[in-house]
Amino acid sequence: DERVLQFYRWVMVNKRAPSTPTHADSAPDMPAQASLDQVSFPHVARFDASATGGDRFWEDYAAGERIAHPQGMTIEEAEHQMATRLYQNTARVHFNQLQQSASRHGRRIVYGGHVISVAHALSFDGLENVLGMAAWNGGSHTNPTFAGDTLFAWSDVLERIDIGRDDIGALRLRLVAVKNVDPSREDVALKVAGEDGRERYHANVVLDLDYVALIPKRAAAG
C-alpha cells in the first residue's frame, strides 16, 4: 500500500466539568514544517500561461510578499450545509438549529473545511499559475464563521523553496481569511492583545493556514 495522506488534527471538545485538567503539556512533539521528501512532484513541460492568464512563475515570488485576493464571498446557510454533507461531516453544530438556539452562539457554525475551501478558492485571484497544494504545515480556525458572514483573504509568501528541479518549485504560503472586513480597504491586525495581556487572533480573523503550494518555473513555460 502507498500512503497518500497523513495529518494531525486537533479538535475542540466541550468539558463536562470546567475544572477538568486539559493535560496541555502532554501534546506530542511535531515538526513545524512538513517534510517534502515524500511528496510526489508532477513533471511540468510546455506550461501554457496563456490558458491561465497569469505571467508569474516560481522565480517571480519573493519571501515577505503579501498578495491581496480582491474578491469577497458571502456564506449562505444552504450552501454551507450542502458542502458539509459532501465532506461527510454530520456534527449537529453545523445542522441542528433547534439545538444550537440554546448554545452560546445561538446559531449553526459553518464547518471549518468549508471556510478553508472558500479561502483557497479566493486565493486563485492573485496567486498566478499555482498548481495546487503539496502539504499543510499547520493551521487554526481562529474564530467561528456563520451564514451571512462575508469572507476575504490574503496570502503571505513565507518561503520560496527550490526542490532541485528545472520545471517546478514550491512556495510556503500563509493563507489568512477574515470575515466582514475588506483588507483592501482597511488594515486588519492578525493578532491583538487581550485584556489579560495575552496575544489573541483578531475577532475578524477566521483562518490562519500555513501550507506549501506547487508552481512551475519559468523554464517550463511553453
Predicted regions and their residues:
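HotDog/MaoC-like acyl-thioester-processing domains
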Residues: 1-41, 46, 147, 154-222
